[in-house]
Amino acid sequence: MTVVPGDHLLEPEAAGGGGGDPPQGGCGSGGGGGGCDRYEPLPPALPAAGEQDCCGERVVINISGLRFETQLKTLCQFPETLLGDPKRRMRYFDPLRNEYFFDRNRPSFDAILYYYQSGGRIRRPVNVPIDIFSEEIRFYQLGEEAMEKFREDEGFLREEERPLPRRDFQRQVWLLFEYPESSGPARGIAIVSVLVILISIVIFCLETLPEFRDEKDYPASPSQDVFEAANNSTSGAPSGASSFSDPFFVVETLCIIWFSFELLVRFFACPSKATFSRNIMNLIDIVAIIPYFITLGTELAERQGNGQQAMSLAILRVIRLVRVFRIFKLSRHSKGLQILGQTLKASMRELGLLIFFLFIGVILFSSAVYFAEADDPSSGFNSIPDAFWWAVVTMTTVGYGDMHPVTIGGKIVGSLCAIAGVLTIALPVPVIVSNFNYFYHRETEGEEQAQYMHVGSCQHLSSSAEELRKARSNSTLSKSEYMVIEEGGMNHSAFPQTPFKTGNSTATCTTNNNPNSCVNIKKIFTDV
């Protein structure tokens, strides 16, 4: 189809100087034999300005050597995408071959093209990894809605928005304590916090050694708790008199001061107090410092002679155990632990099924081994509940050996139990690994990037109308694309030109103040 400019359309000329429609039924005899040559039919009306790019013409898309063909109106359903916007896709056009060339993943484009053909349905091909397909969605600029649909179809959780405080000072403080990568001081605060956590964990472990436990009056057994409590209450010597001068207590106090300061600062600087209070990591921070204040209150009460030490030591033994949860504070500064937590959270359904299958297997095989071993007096399976431990150890392939079947029937049941355990545990593993890979690439995609550039096709383009007409005569570029260029889509005044050499000749490329606009830049996110 030839595009005829509007100012060159032929107007009908009426015979004898009069205007009107040509005679119906052919040229009249009275008008002369040349009457038919004076009238030419008008060409079809050109599309409106908003419909120029959505004609029914076909377009060829070359993906790393594999050619796809579709209609322009199919691509124009999504004008905000790379293929749907003529200005965006023009830089990838090769007028010599009359096609768009993309050096991208070929299997992924089947799903990308189906997205346009189906009106917005996105489906990942089974032979394309999740991280590669998500990169293709970003490259073709399908938008956040398509990305959310893709993640939802893959079974991933929606990413939670993390707003920042509105006030400048509050935002700076929040960034310092919540985002270690935001600045150097924030990284320094994170390092100090990690060191304090490690010191607290080391102190928690060292104070249980026998030599240090004696100094701190740390009983080795519950009976010794009561015995020493009775002696102290009889003699009237307060057990907490020397606790405040103990080195472990001093170091613990310094650690708690830092934990409390960090928690309070983050609480007052957070953008939402309600969200802060519901965060599991903040709850762990609170649980990590509560045992210290309970212990301190108990020590002060005993020092004044108002406490019941026999009861307090038993309670404090449990309270001190809670201090071990401080190790989870490291997950705030470790992306690996965060990824593991997100993976477990996203895989709760699979983990629930695993526990359910294990529960069924434990009941089944513990009952079977009990009845198989019931006739042997030397068997250790005295009841079905006693066999629960053996079934769990066998299905998880641990095999402590403290309980084992001795009869032929019991050994057969044990073999089946081990095989069933291997199959049960192996079933949800691929799903959990897939979730881990997704969260790992999502967390690390901004850290390690490698860029490579390949030559685009914009050296073939020129803003000169004369060169466009020459290219039109040598290729079959669709009229829609030329209309876009001629009407200012690639205007010379809006996009300055930069010459560059290709072989022995010099080509011209529009740069839009960006030296990389003439090449297709792809970011590959790698993991370490």
From Swiss-Prot:
Which stretches are Extracellular in the membrane topology?
Answer: 207-247, 302-315, 371-411
What does the entry report about post-translational modification of this chain?
N-glycosylation promotes the cell surface expression. Phosphorylation on Tyr-452 inhibits its channel activity.
Q: Quickly give the catalysed reaction.
A: K(+)(in) = K(+)(out)
Q: Which SMART domains does the entry mention?
A: BTB
Q: Which residues form a coiled coil?
A: none
| Position of sequence motif Selectivity filter | 397-402
Region Interaction with KCNE4: list its residue ranges.
Answer: 435-528
Which InterPro entries is this protein grouped with?
BTB/POZ_dom, Ion_trans_dom, K_chnl_volt-dep_Kv, K_chnl_volt-dep_Kv1, K_chnl_volt-dep_Kv1.3, SKP1/BTB/POZ_sf, T1-type_BTB, VG_K_chnl
Biological process GO annotation list?
protein homooligomerization
Q: Where is the lipid attached (S-palmitoyl cysteine)?
A: 270
Q: Which UniProt keywords apply?
A: Cell membrane, Glycoprotein, Ion channel, Ion transport, Lipoprotein, Membrane, Palmitate, Phosphoprotein, Potassium, Potassium channel, Potassium transport, Transmembrane, Transmembrane helix, Transport, Voltage-gated channel
Q: How is its activity regulated?
A: Activity is up-regulated by JAK2.
Q: Where is this motif: PDZ-binding?
A: 526-528
Q: How does it sit in the bilayer?
A: Multi-pass membrane protein
Show the ranges annotated as biased composition (Gly residues). Answer: 15-32
Glycan attachment sites = 232
- Phosphotyrosine-modified residues are where? 452
Where is it chiefly localized? Answer: membrane
- Inducing or repressing factors: Up-regulated by lipopolysaccharide and down-regulated by dexamethasone.
Localisation per UniProt entry = Cell membrane
Q: What quaternary arrangement does the UniProt entry report?
A: Homotetramer. Forms heterooligomers with KCNE4 which inhibits KCNA3 activity by impairing localization to the cell membrane. The stoichiometry of KCNA3 and KCNE4 in the heterooligomers are 4:1, 4:2, 4:3 or 4:4 respectively. Increasing the number of KCNE4 subunits steadily slows the activation KCNA3 and decreases its abundance at the cell membrane. However, a single subunit of KCNE4 is sufficient for the cooperative enhancement of the inactivating function of the channel. Interacts with SEC24D; this interaction is reduced in the presence of KCNE4.
Q: What does this protein do?
A: Mediates the voltage-dependent potassium ion permeability of excitable membranes. Assuming opened or closed conformations in response to the voltage difference across the membrane, the protein forms a potassium-selective channel through which potassium ions may pass in accordance with their electrochemical gradient.
Instruction: Indicate the family of this protein.
Output: Belongs to the potassium channel family. A (Shaker) (TC 1.A.1.2) subfamily. Kv1.3/KCNA3 sub-subfamily.
UniProt-recorded name of the protein: Potassium voltage-gated channel subfamily A member 3
Q: Which organism is it from?
A: Mus musculus
